[in-house]
Amino acid sequence: MAVILSVDPCYAGLVGLAEGFRTSNPPRIRECIQCLQAILQFNPPPATQAKTHLQIGRILQQYTKNDDLARRTLEKAVSAELGHGYEEISFEASSILSLVYKDQGQYPLAKQVLRQALEITSGENLYFWQFRLFFQLAEVHACDNEFTASVEVLEMGERIAEQCGSQYMRYNIRHSHNCIIIVLLIMKDVNRVSNILMSTGSFLERWQGQSYQRESLVVFHLLLRVWQLLSVGQAKTVRPYLKQLQQSIQNLTTMTFEGMQPGPNVYEAEKFEWLPREHLCVLVYLVTVMHSMYAGYMDKVLKYSAKALNQVERLKVTSPSALVSVFQLMLLEHTIMCRVVQGQPAHAIKEISQVYQTLKHENCLVRAHKPILHTLLGLYAMSMNLMEQATTHFNIAFKTADNPVLANFVGLNLSIIYIRAGESKQIELSSVMSSIHPSNMATNSHSLQAGYYYVCALRAFFQTRIQDAKKYLRESLKIANAEDLNRLTACSLVLLGHTFLASGNPQEALNMVLPATQLSGKIPDNYIQLWAAGLLRDLYGMLGQPVQASESFHKHHSITKQLIENHMQARKLPEHGLTEWTGAVSPTKSSTIPPQQSFQTWSQPGPSRLS
């Protein structure tokens, strides 16, 4: 007993000192871990040793990249033989250890440690940990593409929620269950997905739970609804649901996690939060950014991305995780596409470099995000008129993308490059066009269908099949107008103007290009404005309107000059060397660009890319 008493003050002092180092600005993680390791030198009781190993493992997992040391440390905490009353140490260690296994791609080990922990909880009323472990196990199965097993785990969790009388957890699990079903169906059966979400919505209407709990589930439900509609490119249809979601998250931020439903079991269950309020806020920002990108509101993309990224930076300090890094990557991806559209290549390549550096330090995210990185580099290279590099990156992304939406998006941009290349790329063009044909698409995306018809029109125009081009453009415009896909509408109108000009009808061509000019100015999209200004200059000249022709000439000249300056600025940056990176080796220095490859304006129609 004397030994224990002599250790306790040391233990408390070292833990307090470690926490001081952890919470310092910046955190002093090395010193924090050294303090915790010093506790073990006193040979404390097994429970104290296990808790200390848990604390060290948690710090290593959250703040360092030393996954192997975190794994070994947490395995000691999990394997410790502790008596009754210390179960939470084992559960938390198992929970964090499964995250380490998952990040390393060791899915069987992650499932094993979670199932072993769940076996211990099955005979106890430890509902908080049961639900946390159920959710984690379902997530691991989903990451391993075992969606049926993931659904079965969540169904088990729902039965536990019914047993303990927690309506909150029952609907929380049902939403997660539906989320996986939506992932499986969204590419094939949009109507069934809508029915599932309507059914869940009716459950929420009937359930009169605590205000905070109910509002958090409403946010979750609306997030799924908005995400589902955006996934199929319905920017107009999603608008009322997005407004509801934004109002709901505002309501949630003003609430506190107040009184629970009566009953000890229910109270224990409803302490659980799978997605904290701070994460929900970032997700709402993210879907708002996605909607703005689809609808062509580039200023809003930058505005909401900046707000969300600020919140992500705070989360990386207070609760760092791979999920927070995913939020950061997705926001950066949309910001980069916006920069490319607006003709800001220097900003774009710097932010692409941020994505590259994040993936370099987050190995668990490389598989999902590397094809996206190549896509972003392809869009950047395409906007810089580096078609060889753009083709290389798009082909890598096209072959490695697991997401059919991304693959189709890449295929559309790759097709534009091949169309511009002429006869030399007809075989490659036919192959890509066949794979992205609507009948072969694994998705019912309105935006991708409209994009496909636009690319078909561009191909027909280059082959001087003017009537076919008009036919495809009418299909593209019908879909784009119905869902407020403004960039695609502007592109289609300018190309339609070219078809009317080729048919000898300059006045009708003018009627198409003028609204496209206004629309591209609102976006704003410098490349479409440049394209439209060049066509307007020629049209006004043909129609005998010299003043308007002169205005269009000066606008074309001004945009061209600004883009040339922006491109030259981007080429001087060391990050520009990423255009030469193919994924085999890390880029260490910028590439040398021959002077003859400087920016050129295309005389032929078509935007530089379909981002």
From Swiss-Prot:
Q: How does it assemble?
A: Component of the cohesin loading complex.
Q: Which family does the UniProt entry place this protein in?
A: Belongs to the SCC4/mau-2 family.
User: What's the stated role of this polypeptide?
Assistant: Required for association of the cohesin complex with chromatin during interphase. Plays a role in sister chromatid cohesion and normal progression through prometaphase.
Where are the residues of the annotated region Disordered?
581-611
Presence of keyword Nucleotidyltransferase: no
Compositionally skewed regions (Polar residues) per UniProt: 585-611
| TPR repeat copies, ranges | 11-46, 91-124, 131-164, 371-404, 490-523
Q: Which residues form a coiled coil?
A: none
- Top-rank taxon: Eukaryota
Q: Where does it reside?
A: Nucleus, Nucleoplasm
Q: What is its main location?
A: nucleus
**What are the UniProt keywords, alphabetically?**
Cell cycle, Cell division, Chromosome partition, Mitosis, Nucleus, Repeat, TPR repeat
Q: Which InterPro entries match?
A: MAU2, TPR-like_helical_dom_sf
Q: What is this protein called?
A: MAU2 chromatid cohesion factor homolog
Biological-process GO terms, alphabetical: cell division; chromosome segregation; maintenance of mitotic sister chromatid cohesion
Q: Which GO terms describe its cellular component?
A: chromatin; nucleoplasm; nucleus; SMC loading complex
